[in-house]
From Swiss-Prot:
One of the components of the core complex of photosystem II (PSII), required for its stability and/or assembly. PSII is a light-driven water:plastoquinone oxidoreductase that uses light energy to abstract electrons from H(2)O, generating O(2) and a proton gradient subsequently used for ATP formation. It consists of a core antenna complex that captures photons, and an electron transfer chain that converts photonic excitation into a charge separation. The lineage of its organism: Bacteria, Bacillati, Cyanobacteriota, Cyanophyceae, Synechococcales. PSII is composed of 1 copy each of membrane proteins PsbA, PsbB, PsbC, PsbD, PsbE, PsbF, PsbH, PsbI, PsbJ, PsbK, PsbL, PsbM, PsbT, PsbX, PsbY, PsbZ, Psb30/Ycf12, peripheral proteins PsbO, CyanoQ (PsbQ), PsbU, PsbV and a large number of cofactors. It forms dimeric complexes. One of its GO terms (molecular function) is phosphate ion binding. Keywords: Membrane, Photosynthesis, Photosystem II, Thylakoid, Transmembrane, Transmembrane helix. This is Photosystem II reaction center protein H. The chain crosses the membrane at residues 29-49. It is a single-pass membrane protein. One of its GO terms (cellular component) is photosystem II. GO terms for biological process: photosynthesis; protein stabilization. It is found in: Cellular thylakoid membrane. InterPro entries: PSII_PsbH, PSII_PsbH_sf. Its main location: membrane.
């Protein structure tokens, strides 16, 4: 028999919806928006690293990071 703990009692409500699927798209569009924003963020970082995106007055020195 499993031992009951206070932490387990606090976390039990989080697991009460296990296995249930909400019909429809749910929060999928929100996830898609955040994934697109994260992609834009990564592209900006990549362009800064490759010096394809130059910002006036901001010098980028990647040698200090290594």
């Amino acid at each position: 028999m499993a031992q009951r703990t206070r932490l387990g009692d606090l976390l039990r409500p989080l697991n009460s919806e296990y296995g249930k699927v909400v019909p429809g798209w749910g929060t999928t569009p929100v996830m898609g928006i955040f994934m697109a924003l994260f992609l834009v963020f990564l592209l900006v970082i990549l362009q800064l690293y490759n010096r394809s995106l130059l910002l006036d007055g901001i010098t980028v020195n990647w040698n200090g990071l290594g």
